[in-house]
Amino acid sequence: MAMTYHLDVVSAELQMFSGLVEKIQVTGSEGELGIYPGHAPLLTAIKPGMIRIVKQHGHEEFIYLSGGILEVQPGSVTVLADTAIRGQDLDEARALEAKRKAEEHIKSSHGDVDYAQASAELAKAIAKLRVIELTKKAM
């Protein structure tokens, strides 16, 4: 049997996931993180993107995170997300529209602040579309 640890994914609105997992993949402030059983303790910021959860027996779940904090302790991992949305709950049409608007905003930006904000919005829209795509593949 594969080694596991307990994972909690919590947003301000609700507890999104709680259970045993084999591993997770998430984007931290320093880059991509793969958290396996026995990982060293860690506290890091999470960038907007997805968390890939590999549950017991290899079943996968994808959740969009708008950012937050990841805490790794012996035997347990906690994700405190600003916003968390399951892949099947994301609206593909709205994500595509947000991507289009962000791309337009980038083209028409007139300063570093405008460009940075538009780039962040584009990254969020692309992350949502990636979560939707991976969720469809996993079904």
Curated annotation (Swiss-Prot):
It is a peripheral membrane protein. Signal peptide: none annotated. It is found in: Cell inner membrane. It comes from the Bacteria. GO terms for molecular function: ATP binding; proton-transporting ATP synthase activity, rotational mechanism. GO terms for cellular component: plasma membrane; proton-transporting ATP synthase complex. Gene3D superfamilies: ATP synthase delta/epsilon subunit, C-terminal domain (1.20.5.440), F0F1 ATP synthase delta/epsilon subunit, N-terminal (2.60.15.10). Keywords: ATP synthesis, Cell inner membrane, Cell membrane, CF(1), Hydrogen ion transport, Ion transport, Membrane, Transport. It holds the Pfam family ATP-synt_DE_N. F-type ATPases have 2 components, CF(1) - the catalytic core - and CF(0) - the membrane proton channel. CF(1) has five subunits: alpha(3), beta(3), gamma(1), delta(1), epsilon(1). CF(0) has three main subunits: a, b and c. Belongs to the ATPase epsilon chain family. PANTHER family: ATP SYNTHASE DELTA/EPSILON CHAIN, ATP SYNTHASE EPSILON CHAIN, CHLOROPLASTIC. NCBIfam families: ATP_synt_epsi, PRK00571.1-4. Produces ATP from ADP in the presence of a proton gradient across the membrane. This is ATP synthase epsilon chain.
